[in-house]
């Protein structure tokens, strides 16, 4: 699967390439945004949240990718197992599997001539930031890390409600069916729950030498905004910083007409 779409007007040099990356168990659908007029572009890996997909809610990652290209930065966004265009069974989704998929995407970027392998950053949204943090334990060359509404607690953290309500079902069936108001039911494997319980992403934050930007909304009811401050407090880079967006929820109001903070968040990110 290699489809290329021209998204610029400058001689057709700004491109979005739909690709499939092999992780040896299934393929990872991805969109690689880059500009052919540049050599060795800095690149950002975009990690979506639980039950979401590579474009993210309200097409946040689509808009971010476009804005990044405008300033000469490539990006890659992709679907975890069973999400978006992924053909893998949804029960294949596990937290450690997401970390491995992200590492596979990083390794793919390092094979691309257009990518400056010494200037790859990563951005995670919600649980995608937790994936990012866990990855930082093993992929130290990442130059910078950005958390959007990140949930990077060690262990269960903000997923306690799901553990209380659905873990027994996962024990009995091998997976739990979790109702979602904005999509069909989410199927999460027992392994997903066990991985969340047993992993320590904040340790990745503590070990990571690069700068971290943590952005959160002050009206986030899923991941309280003070956790963004905890992320930065655990960073050892003095350039790390936290930005709290006023009057903003977990998804930066992107689905609320006339109240979206998405553009503000993207500008802060850039």
Predicted regions mapped to residue ranges:
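Active-site glycine-rich loops that stabilize anionic/oxyanionic intermediates
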Residues: 41, 48-53
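Short beta-to-alpha linker loops that shape the active-site pocket of alpha/beta-hydrolase fold enzymes
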Residues: 50, 79-89, 151, 248-249, ...
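N-terminal cap/lid segment of alpha/beta-hydrolase-fold proteins
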Residues: 3-42, 261
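Catalytic nucleophile-loop/oxyanion-hole region of alpha/beta-hydrolase
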Residues: 83-116
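Primarily recognizes the serine-hydrolase "nucleophile elbow" in alpha/beta-hydrolase
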Residues: 104-167
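The conserved beta1-alpha1 loop
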Residues: 47-49, 216-217
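The alpha/beta-hydrolase serine catalytic core
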Residues: 18, 28, 139-240, 244, ...
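The serine-hydrolase catalytic nucleophile loop
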Residues: 51-65, 80
């Amino acid at each position: 699967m290699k489809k290329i779409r021209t998204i610029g007007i400058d001689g057709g040099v700004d491109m979005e390439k739909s690709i499939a990356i092999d992780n040896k168990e299934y393929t990872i659908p991805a969109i690689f945004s880059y500009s052919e007029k540049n050599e060795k572009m800095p690149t950002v890996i975009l990690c979506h949240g639980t039950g979401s997909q590579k474009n993210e809610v309200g097409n946040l990652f689509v808009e971010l990718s476009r804005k990044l290209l405008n300033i000469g930065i490539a990006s890659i966004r992709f679907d975890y197992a069973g999400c978006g265009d992924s053909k893998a069974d949804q029960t294949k989704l596990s937290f450690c599997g997401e970390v491995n998929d992200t590492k596979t995407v990083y390794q793919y970027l390092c094979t691309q001539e257009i990518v400056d392998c010494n200037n790859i950053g990563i951005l995670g949204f919600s649980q995608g930031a937790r994936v990012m943090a866990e990855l930082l334990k093993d992929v130290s060359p990442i130059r910078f890390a950005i958390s959007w509404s990140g949930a990077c607690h060690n262990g269960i953290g903000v997923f306690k409600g799901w553990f209380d309500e659905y873990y027994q079902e996962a024990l009995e069936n091998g997976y739990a069916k979790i109702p979602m108001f904005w999509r069909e039911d989410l199927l999460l494997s027992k392994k997903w729950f066990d991985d969340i319980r047993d992993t320590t992403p904040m340790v990745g934050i503590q070990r990571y030498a690069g700068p971290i930007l943590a952005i959160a909304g002050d009206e986030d009811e899923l991941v309280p905004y003070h956790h963004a401050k905890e992320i930065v407090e655990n960073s050892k880079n003095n350039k790390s910083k936290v930005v709290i967006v006023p009057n903003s929820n977990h998804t930066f109001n992107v689905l609320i007409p006339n109240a979206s903070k998405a553009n503000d968040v993207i500008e802060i990110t850039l």
